[in-house]
């Protein structure tokens, strides 16, 4: 297993989210400096400044329109950037919403979470936003992904649950067995949903009918944060507490790989166009893991 790192910014920039674009490059959010960066596989980097710099771009995801969409958690907007670097943004109707997770839905729209206001949002290519109120308060909806069942699935960090919403807005909440697990990242492997429990040091799996399994990490203080599936029963995750990248199989077998630089704060993770795993390091770099 080869693990390497590349510097993409100084420590004040805060690389956070990462996604693979439709043109074969990697796209990152620089949460602390208000920029979106494009990184090619040969190391060429372009950075695009956002206004205001304190907008805090957070999670980024490819859209069905060939652009990248991202949340701006500090100024409560949804951003869009083309592969040529042209940006625009749209305000979330509910004030102080704190958008965080974002993903392409099965309906041609982007779906996102509102951490501060217990809502799930939907935005069209033209910027029209619809919001759906969750049946719980103080839930802190975090990451969101499209499920294999045509619905959207999301973590409720403070409600200790996984939520499901259909494209029509019907919502079901599935409580987790472990108290105060604080789920964050979530991904679909095409069969089930996998998620991380940052406070419990576990990886979870939930079937589309709501059956939950949990797998403890060797280091329960590992603080798993983001997770991505590369195939059915093969997921990779970041663990910033243990400064590592982990892998879990469908049977729950876990392997962890230490990052070269200490305390590098890995957050977002994606499968790159080269088949490797790429993680954003908040201290200013990206890590590449060749399986």
Residue ranges of model-derived segments:
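A short helix->beta-strand "capping" segment at the edge of beta-propeller domains
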Residues: 1-12
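Beta-rich, blade/repeat-based domains predominating
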Residues: 10-23, 53-64, 94-107, 136-149, ...
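A short loop-to-beta-strand structural motif that recurs across blades of beta-propeller domains
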Residues: 35-37, 76-79, 118-121, 161-163, ...
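Short loop/turn segments that connect beta-strands within beta-propeller blades
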Residues: 40-43, 82-85, 123-128, 165-170, ...
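Solenoidal tandem-repeat scaffolds enriched in leucines and small polar residues
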Residues: 111-118, 125-173
């Amino acid at each position: 297993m080869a693990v390497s790192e590349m510097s993409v910014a100084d420590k004040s920039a805060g690389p956070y989210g990462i996604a693979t674009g439709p043109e074969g490059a990697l796209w990152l959010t620089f949460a602390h400096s208000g920029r979106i960066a494009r990184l090619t596989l040969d190391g060429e980097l372009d950075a695009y400044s956002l206004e205001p710099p304190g907008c805090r771009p957070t999670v980024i995801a490819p859209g069905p329109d060939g652009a990248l969409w991202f949340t701006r958690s500090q100024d409560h907007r949804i951003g869009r950037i083309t592969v040529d670097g042209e940006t625009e943004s749209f305000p979330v109707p509910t004030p102080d919403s704190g958008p965080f997770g974002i993903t392409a839905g099965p309906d041609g729209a982007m779906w996102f979470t509102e951490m501060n206001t217990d809502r799930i949002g939907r935005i069209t290519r033209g910027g029209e936003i619809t919001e759906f109120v969750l049946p719980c308060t103080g839930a802190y909806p975090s990451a969101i992904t499209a499920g294999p069942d045509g619905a959207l699935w999301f973590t409720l960090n403070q409600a200790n649950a996984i939520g499901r919403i259909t494209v029509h807005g019907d919502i079901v909440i599935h409580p987790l067995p472990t108290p105060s697990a604080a789920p964050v990242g979530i991904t679909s492997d095409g069969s089930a949903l996998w998620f991380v429990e940052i406070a419990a040091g576990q990886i979870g799996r939930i079937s589309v009918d709501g059956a939950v399994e949990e797998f403890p990490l060797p280091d329960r203080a590992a603080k798993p944060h983001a997770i991505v599936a590369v195939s059915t029963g093969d997921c990779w995750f970041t663990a910033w507490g243990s400064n590592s990248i982990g892998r879990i199989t469908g049977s729950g077998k876990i392997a962890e790989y230490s990052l070269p630089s200490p305390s590098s704060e890995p957050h977002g993770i994606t499968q790159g166009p080269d088949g490797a795993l790429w993680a954003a390091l908040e201290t200013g770099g990206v890590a590449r893991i060749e399986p």
